[in-house]
Amino acid sequence: MNLNMLHDNVLIEALEECNSSSPIQLPDSAKKKPTQGKVVAVGPGVYNHSGNILPMTIKVGDVVFYRQWAGNEIEFHEKKYIVMKESDIIAKEA
């Protein structure tokens, strides 16, 4: 991955639920957005009031859970990702 995230931004590859057994196909606007993904890049963190960087608690490879409408979708090298702040992540697998 040749994409360097800045500040407390996290780049996530969404892990989508597979419901292919249903004969009903919903339009994209009606589908539930993924809320779980794999972290593929993280920024260094944010600066505190003393000018020191607060390190990230999320690292590359973590599987995380996030708010349904968190972040922004981007496309990089013909693949879709979600960029969000670390504070939008609500949990990670242990």
Curated annotation (Swiss-Prot):
Q: Which SUPFAM superfamilies match?
A: GroES-like (SSF50129)
Q: Does the keyword Zinc apply?
A: no
Q: Give a GO molecular function annotation for the protein.
A: protein-folding chaperone binding
The UniProt keyword set, sorted, is: Chaperone, Cytoplasm, Stress response
Its BP terms in the Gene Ontology are: chaperone cofactor-dependent protein refolding
Q: What's an example GO cellular component term for this entry? A: cytoplasm
In the UniProt record, does the keyword Transmembrane occur? no
Compartments (UniProt record): Cytoplasm
Q: Which family does it belong to?
A: Belongs to the GroES chaperonin family.
| Subunit and partners | Heptamer of 7 subunits arranged in a ring. Interacts with the chaperonin GroEL.
The UniProt function text for this chain reads: Together with the chaperonin GroEL, plays an essential role in assisting protein folding. The GroEL-GroES system forms a nano-cage that allows encapsulation of the non-native substrate proteins and provides a physical environment optimized to promote and accelerate protein folding. GroES binds to the apical surface of the GroEL ring, thereby capping the opening of the GroEL channel.
Q: What is the protein named?
A: Co-chaperonin GroES
Species of origin: Ehrlichia chaffeensis
The primary gene name is: groES
